[in-house]
């Protein structure tokens, strides 16, 4: 294994094991466009009020705040750019994006989305999450955040709990910034191509922390799944049924561990400087850590 640096893992217990998994199928690669949002104002002054029935049918910035009990649905023209400006919103149903060009969840203030019978966010369009605030997304049985197209995170603090996958995109899942904690999931991050360029990602999963696969029938079956970490800090823990590490990107270390629920694990470098300390939510057997400071040697 390349790009590895000696790290001491003190297993008084930890929760980390981004079981990185990629499908072994090797075929011609395909490139999908990433979400592109431009000339859209995110300010509160420019934002419209959410329609009373919760259905958005045209482009624009929409303010969502307070307790929202009706489903929020975006069903706009295919070329429409829609921004949902979440500011102190408590949304007690699925946010359903049926059609639009690109959609942004801009997290201006602490907000939450909770669903008991569907995905927390269910998008059939390109979806981007950004903003300075905190967003908590909970799905009892399904994915917390799901996109049939591309899913990009560029900012915000995300607290994710899912009955199935934490963040799932059929095509590309890209993390360009922000802080993300997937506290409960089957697979924390899943897409055809998973790329992490910046930010802090912590995962707790019963299966794979990061899974790049063709499992979803909507994915292009001629594509090659890939996992790339170019920056930021990624720490994960899980059972790691098919642990596979990134083929390109920054340095990483992966270690088999025996960790019980509520154990703590401290990871230090060769100079005894702390890299990360976490508490395991559940028993785990695999620990993965990737940071820009990890180099070969």
Enumerate the predicted regions with their spans.
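A composition-driven surface/loop motif
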Residues: 5-297
């Amino acid at each position: 294994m390349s790009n590895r640096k000696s790290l001491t893992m003190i297993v008084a217990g930890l929760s980390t094991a981004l079981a990185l998994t990629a499908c072994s199928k090797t075929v011609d690669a395909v490139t999908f466009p990433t979400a592109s949002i431009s000339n859209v104002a995110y300010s509160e002054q420019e934002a419209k009020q959410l329609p009373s029935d919760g259905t958005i049918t045209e482009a624009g910035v929409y303010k969502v705040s307070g307790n929202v009990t009706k489903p929020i649905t975006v069903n706009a023209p295919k070329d429409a750019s829609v921004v949902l400006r979440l500011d102190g919103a408590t949304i007690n149903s699925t946010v359903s994006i049926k059609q639009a060009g690109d959609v942004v969840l801009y997290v201006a203030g602490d907000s939450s989305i909770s669903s008991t019978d569907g995905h927390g966010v269910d998008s059939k369009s390109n979806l981007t999450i950004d903003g300075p605030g905190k967003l908590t997304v909970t799905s009892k049985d399904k994915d917390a955040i799901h996109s049939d197209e591309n899913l990009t995170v560029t900012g915000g603090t995300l607290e994710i709990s899912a009955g199935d996958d934490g963040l799932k995109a059929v095509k590309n899942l890209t993390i360009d910034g922000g802080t993300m904690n997937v506290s409960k999931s089957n697979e924390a991050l899943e897409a055809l191509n998973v790329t992490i360029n910046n930010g802090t990602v912590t995962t707790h999963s019963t299966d794979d922390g990061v899974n790049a696969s063709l499992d979803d029938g909507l994915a292009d079956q001629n594509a090659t799944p890939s996992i790339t970490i170019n920056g930021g800090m990624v720490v994960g823990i899980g059972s790691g049924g098919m642990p596979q590490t990134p083929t390109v990107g920054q340095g990483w270390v992966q270690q088999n561990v025996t960790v019980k629920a509520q154990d703590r694990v401290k990871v230090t470098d060769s100079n005894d400087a702390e890299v990360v300390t976490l508490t395991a939510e559940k028993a785990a057997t695999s620990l993965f850590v990737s940071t820009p400071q990890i180099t070969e040697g």
